[in-house]
Amino acid sequence: MALKSYKPTTPGQRGLVLIDRSELWKGRPVKALTEGLSKHGGRNNTGRITMRRKGGGAKRLYRIVDFKRNKMDVAATVERIEYDPNRTAFIALVKYEDGEQAYILAPQRLAVGDTVVASQKADIKPGNAMPFSGMPIGTIIHNIEMKPGKGGQIARAAGTYAQFVGRDGGYAQIRLSSGELRLVRQECMATVGAVSNPDNSNQNYGKAGRMRHKGVRPSVRGVVMNPIDHPHGGGEGRTSGGRHPVTPWGKPTKGAKTRNKKKASSQLIIRSRHAKKKGR
């Protein structure tokens, strides 16, 4: 999908760059594959804000997307490509030979009428899913499981992908777009191709109101807050914060390592995504 820029006929149109979604399905989603979605405004079950800058926005229906791809050796035809308000990627409605319908993440170069299949060893074409044990090294992949049968967790956002670069015992080595090199079990499933909508990050929404429609609220800098609200707050007049940059909870930000050294998954990370910085 290409980008669409607008003439500055109004202040909100000036600089506006959006994704051209004219080729996507214009109707409503499949009712059996949707659920209601209530808003929480970034609050958890105790009512406290756990995710700042969230709230409001247009009402959404949740589309039930199949991240597991565990319906093996049954071919499915792509019925249509749809917009999903709950994620940056597009989704594809597929219909299996037995009549069942499902939503999957739409990879790049997947078109209406294409056939996709999940199998122990499938063709290397966008949308096909298989475990690493049946996949050739060098394959570009997305929707990667971290635990067998749990469903894809890595490389699900628009334009993202990873590369299968090697085998090591019962593990597969994958290189993520962040530069991280990590291991996952060879029984884990992954889908061939890169996720659709790679131009998503090049959009310019043009005005604050468009972000409010998406449920995004303003972000306030710590240095303009009061001391009770942020470690950078307070002071007479404009100040620099007076200390190294930290989060509202006092944790170093902008580059300092804050990962727990005892985290179990550290032994599965061969090369950190930070290794390219400062010669680490």
UniProtKB/Swiss-Prot annotation:
Residues 254-264, 271-280 have a biased composition (Basic residues). SMART domains: Ribosomal_L2, Ribosomal_L2_C. One of its GO terms (cellular component) is large ribosomal subunit. InterPro entries: NA-bd_OB-fold, Rib_uL2_dom2, Ribosomal_uL2, Ribosomal_uL2_bac/org-type, Ribosomal_uL2_C, Ribosomal_uL2_CS, Ribosomal_uL2_dom3, Ribosomal_uL2_RNA-bd_dom. Gene3D superfamilies: 2.30.30.30, Nucleic acid-binding proteins (2.40.50.140), Ribosomal protein L2, domain 3 (4.10.950.10). It comes from the Bacteria. Signal peptide: none annotated. GO terms for molecular function: rRNA binding; structural constituent of ribosome; transferase activity. SUPFAM superfamilies: Nucleic acid-binding proteins (SSF50249), Translation proteins SH3-like domain (SSF50104). Keywords: Ribonucleoprotein, Ribosomal protein, RNA-binding, rRNA-binding. Residues 226-280 are annotated as: Disordered. GO terms for biological process: cytoplasmic translation. NCBIfam families: rplB_bact. HAMAP family: Ribosomal_uL2_B. Part of the 50S ribosomal subunit. Forms a bridge to the 30S subunit in the 70S ribosome. One of the primary rRNA binding proteins. Required for association of the 30S and 50S subunits to form the 70S ribosome, for tRNA binding and peptide bond formation. It has been suggested to have peptidyltransferase activity; this is somewhat controversial. Makes several contacts with the 16S rRNA in the 70S ribosome. Belongs to the universal ribosomal protein uL2 family. This is Large ribosomal subunit protein uL2. It comes from Roseobacter denitrificans (strain ATCC 33942 / OCh 114).
